[in-house]
Amino acid sequence: MSLRSDLINALYDENQKYDVCGIISAEGKIYPLGSDTKVLSTIFELFSRPIINKIAEKHGYIVEEPKQQNHYPDFTLYKPSEPNKKIAIDIKTTYTNKENEKIKFTLGGYTSFIRNNTKNIVYPFDQYIAHWIIGYVYTRVATRKSSLKTYNINELNEIPKPYKGVKVFLQDKWVIAGDLAGSGNTTNIGSIHAHYKDFVEGKGIFDSEDEFLDYWRNYERTSQLRNDKYNNISEYRNWIYRGRK
């Protein structure tokens, strides 16, 4: 099986219960996770690390993580004999308040490495041949007062967890990318806004990775500039048809 197939199977493995109760101290105290999305995103990245390392080693890949904060990607995989065929893996997390809601992710900046080959990226962008997203989706559970206390190892079953119903997928970034910025005035690429199965099946809006890259390399930062150029995929294709005018 391929690296990708093995990784997908490992992520879907029913033995991966994604059942973290909290953070344990050297004294044996367990601190419940709480509902902070940044904390939970870190937890799911920790889930992914040993899976990625195990499958990568099986296929002869080296795994590197960024030495600088906010550098892309979370994991770089490559074979020493093929340094210009690197694979980027980024871990993304989102939540729903009830099951089967539509979901959306932010997929990284559009003004950094896709425009400047070496900006905020572990290796030059043109050394990567694939960009994969491992996406985690969970349903939020209302925080209870019991999450404010600490526990010991004998009280594991009493510790409230702020999430349930974890789902995971692996997909190419360009396949699940949308045509709108991630949120507000940020310069992040937004994903499609769709159901979980649409991410699994890759029901995106771009015809190719080249179209995705060209769209986001030319996407303007402000709405005023976009109004003179394009705001969405339909307007982009018209812009192309007009000779980029």
Swiss-Prot record:
Domain of life: Bacteria
Organism of derivation: Escherichia coli
Record flagged with keyword Membrane: no
Cofactor(s), by name: Mg(2+)
EC numbers: 3.1.21.4
One Pfam entry name: Endonuc-EcoRV
CDD domains assigned: EcoRV-like (cd22323)
Mutation effect (residue 188 to D): Loss of activity
UniProt-recorded name of the protein: Type II restriction enzyme EcoRV
Keywords recorded for this protein, A-Z: DNA-binding, Endonuclease, Hydrolase, Magnesium, Metal-binding, Nuclease, Plasmid, Restriction system
Bound cofactor: record note: Binds 2 magnesium ions per subunit.
Gene Ontology BP annotations: DNA restriction-modification system
Binding-site list for Mg(2+) 2: 45, 74
Outcome when changing residue 74 to A: Loss of activity
Positions of the catalytic residues: 74, 90, 92
Quaternary structure annotation from Swiss-Prot or TrEMBL: Homodimer.
Listed result of changing residue 183 to A/T: Decrease in activity
Annotated catalysed reactions: Endonucleolytic cleavage of DNA to give specific double-stranded fragments with terminal 5'-phosphates
Residues reported to bind Mg(2+) 1: 74, 90
